[in-house]
UniProtKB/Swiss-Prot annotation:
It comes from Salmonella paratyphi B (strain ATCC BAA-1250 / SPB7). ATP-dependent carboxylate-amine ligase which exhibits weak glutamate--cysteine ligase activity. InterPro entries: GCL_type2/YbdK_subfam (IPR050141), GCS2 (IPR006336), Gln_synth/guanido_kin_cat_dom (IPR014746), YbdK (IPR011793). GO terms for molecular function: ATP binding; glutamate-cysteine ligase activity. It comes from the Bacteria. Keywords: ATP-binding, Ligase, Nucleotide-binding. This is Putative glutamate--cysteine ligase 2. Its EC number is 6.3.2.2. The gene is ybdK. Belongs to the glutamate--cysteine ligase type 2 family. YbdK subfamily.
Amino acid sequence: MALNDFHVSEPYTLGIELEMQVINPPGYDLSQDSSTLIDAVKPQLTAGEIKHDITESMLEMATGVCRDIDQAAAQLSAMQHVILQAASEHHLGICGGGTHPFQKWQRQEVCDNERYQRTLENFGYLIQQATVFGQHVHVGCANGDDAIYLLHGLSHFVPHFIALSAASPYMQGADTRFACARLNIFSAFPDNGPMPWVSNWQEFTGLFRRLSYTTMIDSIKDLHWDIRPSPAFGTVEVRVMDTPLTLDHAINMAGLIQATAHWLLTERPFKPQEQDYLLYKFNRFQACRYGLEGVLTDAYTGDRRRLADDTLRLLDNVTPSARKLGADSAIDALRLQVKKGGNEAQYMREFIADGGSLIGLVQKHCEIWAGQ
């Protein structure tokens, strides 16, 4: 299939997608009733979109094109209200978190959707195992070459985005010892991790053409890279974050990515090179395993530094851009989070260490999302 031309969009505009867990109280396992919930809420939407994801226990909230994080927050808040009301009427719960802590993948029903059924045929049980929940952030770009530069620039900070959003320490009833176990689910996919190296949009179109020869790639949506260009939207999409437990944290992560994109495209602090990716997966692993306590290694010098320290440096670098975009509140909140030394994965472990159960943890997550 031919690749769409890169749609020109207003630089730094935002789109946010949140994959939510649909929960079945009182056992607090995943429900298989997302279709019922989606049908109930669609007629009530005034902005944004609520739609299926891979399995019937997943529900995706997606904003429209937003100028800033305030507009995105307003759209997501309105959708959140409608979904919670419908969920209550259907005796269901909704929550964030990158994984459900004790669901069994064998029980997950793939949505009755042509694309997902085709994906099930291609990937088998891997698709059921991919019942995990992430936040994706789109940032607008003026042209395809800017999109490729931005993708390479943002790739420097994939560990930072993972560590700040990590919220998936439990899986299949066990503590994985990872801060973010969600991304491990995709390790068996042939397109896992970073996009293969290209230096401009023309090279990317050639890459996509060759990938389509495999017969497994019909559109850009079939590529599961950590960051990918989305030519139909005119955006670059960052896909490595766990779905947060609160809407506020989701907005803060989007604000960071928007501000980082502005800094990268206006300052051009990097000259992208293929060697930039030499230690990409090692640094990504550190963030998934240890969160903000992970250690980054420089591919050129071999220097090592704590991820928390480097995240503070990133926040300082993007602060002027955040002010211009109206995202400085997000940077301030994330800076405070890093200085306190925590993420949501640590909160979850503390809940269990204090005597809580995994069932109680999911119940608490539903209460948090509902603002209780």
